[in-house]
Amino acid sequence: MVRVEGDRVLVETGTLTAVIEKGFITSLRSRRTGEEFIRPFDVSQEAALQLLYRSWDLVQLDDRAPKEGEIRCLQLSPERAQVVFHCWDGDGVIEITADPDTGDLIIEPSAYGSRPGVVSCRWVIRGLREDLELVAPVKQGLRLPLDDPLIKGSRWEWPMFWEAQLAILQGDKSGLWVHSQDTRFRYKALRVGSESDAHALGLETEAYGPVEGNLGAGGVAWGVNVYDGDWRVPAARYRDWLWKAYDLAAEERKRPAWLPTITLALSWCPTDPDLLDALAQRVPPERVLLHVPNWRTDQYDENYPAFVASDEGKAFIRKAQAMGFHLAPHFNTVDMDPTGPVYPLLRDFQYRDLWSGRLHGWGWADGGYLSVPESNLARTKHRDKKVMVKIHPGLAMWRSVLGESILAAAQDLPLDTVFTDVSLCVSNLQNAMVEGMTPAEGMLRLIRDVSSLGDGLAVGGEGLNEITMQGLTFAQAHLLTEDPEQLKRPYACDLNQFLWGKLCRIIGYTHCGGQSETDRLVRAVYDAQGAIPTLTVDSAEEITSPTPEVEEVLRKAGR
């Protein structure tokens, strides 16, 4: 039931009752228990519907004086209502329905103005009870109070940083959650906190870039519901939807049989044959996954997409294969060296930032980061500074060039597993659409193209989200923080591995050397997130004469 009563919309489903005023949910109760999840707040403090501009200006669609406006409720049918906004700086609609099967309250916001440059439409859920903790697919799973300094005021773009389109608010033995079932690769963002309330969430729908002339955004529906139990209850429902929406049962059948048997991973593994002998003394090789970055004739992060094995790299790979190790030489997804011969063929399809218009990528010199040169000439002259640009994966020509190069290496060595770097780089862009695909959709297509090369390849990646996990077998996981003091607080949870660990497992990315207190704290984070125990070592001696931390990892992996 969705019913308008004056300036309020009342909603009743099989699971909840809700009251909506001026676009805000001002009451959300469990029908089973009567538990209320929203505390009282002043709906006039800020607007429920907002526009975010490319300049980072946030415009409120409200009716506060002196910028007077009108916000009214409209009954369209017994099961459908709208909150209509006619305000000083823009207009908008919040569509309100209910799902009779799930009991979800469905909210679909949209807004626009005459001023160009709109990036997103934001709908705000305010007044969340202060005991509720955010459980979110950010950096492979976090659980923190909304006002925690690690996340307060933060904004996470889907799917690169907000890795699945859901957010869970966990109480003692119950909670509420919000999610989308969008399958059109619509860009979104999650804002933690609002202008007037730390205990709030902002749910954004972004327009595809370019946005310089864009006037509005919308078109994504958000489902809100309550639940009994812990966060795994709504997460399981979302996982079930994922499996059906993307036919992931078929993807499960493609994963290698060795994936669940891996008990140890080495990130950034050196090509030292003695290291293989030392590892084999502690852990059966068939249970070890090696990420090998420096196996080519070229230096690391230079001359992509050229993948030619050096004699040293080839000897290491063949010895590891003969011993039974699973190894993944380091390739890439979208990075390429602009000093290379294929750059002129692809230059028109480089990633450009949605906000600044600058080229995505980097250079590296004197131990520090450099931006990509904006001189077309300079970009082609500085291999010594490891300049890399990113080519949109929606471009079929790029996937062809990359695939041909990876296939040649895979057949030469030969390989059954590869690691593809920067697969997490799938954000909205100034040039978001190439050949009808966003970077997110294009990256999934690229990963699947690589996995189908030759007789088939298991593909690893950097970072992991609900799009790339559909094609990846394993992925390096980035940390929310590397600050030792912040790491002492148990912020991590295994939400992401709960969602898709059957398809793709995570391994450590950094601080896996077991040499410091920071390394120990990082291992606790990765353990909490369900990662494969991971080491980063420089020599065989670190295995034969391990620190206590390394010894603990080896002992568990070898059991």
Report each predicted region and the residues it spans:
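Carbohydrate-recognition beta-sandwich/jelly-roll modules
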Residues: 10-289, 294, 310-315, 319, ...
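Active-site-adjacent "subsite" loops/lids of carbohydrate-active enzymes
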Residues: 318, 329-408, 483-502
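Flexible loop/turn segments at secondary-structure boundaries
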Residues: 271-272, 296-301, 334-339, 425-430, ...
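A structural motif corresponding to the C-terminal end of an alpha-helix
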Residues: 316-325, 408-416, 449-458, 529
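Active-site groove signature of glycoside hydrolases
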Residues: 286-295, 401-432
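Aromatic- and glycine-enriched glycan-recognition loops and surfaces
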Residues: 260-358, 363, 397-404, 441-447
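Active-site-proximal substrate-binding groove within the catalytic cores of carbohydrate-active enzymes
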Residues: 204-205, 213-219, 223, 396, ...
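Short, Gly/Pro- and small/polar-rich lid/capping loops
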Residues: 1-5
